[in-house]
Amino acid sequence: MGQSVSAIRRVSRLRRHARLRKRIAGTQQRPRLVVHRSARHIHVQLVNDANGTTVAAASSIETDVRGLDGDKKARSVRVGQLIAERAKAADIDTVVFDRGGYTYGGRIAALADAARENGLKF
């Protein structure tokens, strides 16, 4: 017997993320925009890998995002807007996008597009 399909997909995603992390790293001027997607929520952080700190974060668990009507993609758009606002407050305008091994589509693309529309460059 082999592994379940969901276990294989998870391991494959983690391998993709490990390959991606070999090539990218965040700095003070250009932090890494890290995305984590679960079945229900989406989380995003700006990480400075030089000293291992989180500069800013946003999530669909926050109360102003939870109250939104609509689907998960609409919440992802709002999270993208929030992280762009918080990055501006921290004087950050350019980031390195780390999609976490997830395919660039759906909620991940919606979050990235919303962050770009609100002033983040990547």
UniProtKB/Swiss-Prot annotation:
Keyword Phosphoprotein: no
InterPro entries: Ribosomal_uL18_bac-type (IPR004389), Ribosomal_uL18_bac/euk (IPR005484)
GO biological process: translation
Disulfide bonding pattern of the chain: none
Magnesium as UniProt keyword: no
Subunit structure: Part of the 50S ribosomal subunit; part of the 5S rRNA/L5/L18/L25 subcomplex. Contacts the 5S and 23S rRNAs.
Family: Belongs to the universal ribosomal protein uL18 family.
Function as written in the Swiss-Prot or TrEMBL entry: This is one of the proteins that bind and probably mediate the attachment of the 5S RNA into the large ribosomal subunit, where it forms part of the central protuberance.
UniProt protein name: Large ribosomal subunit protein uL18
Species, as recorded: Mycobacterium ulcerans (strain Agy99)
Upper taxonomic lineage: Bacteria, Bacillati, Actinomycetota, Actinomycetes, Mycobacteriales
Designated gene of the protein: rplR
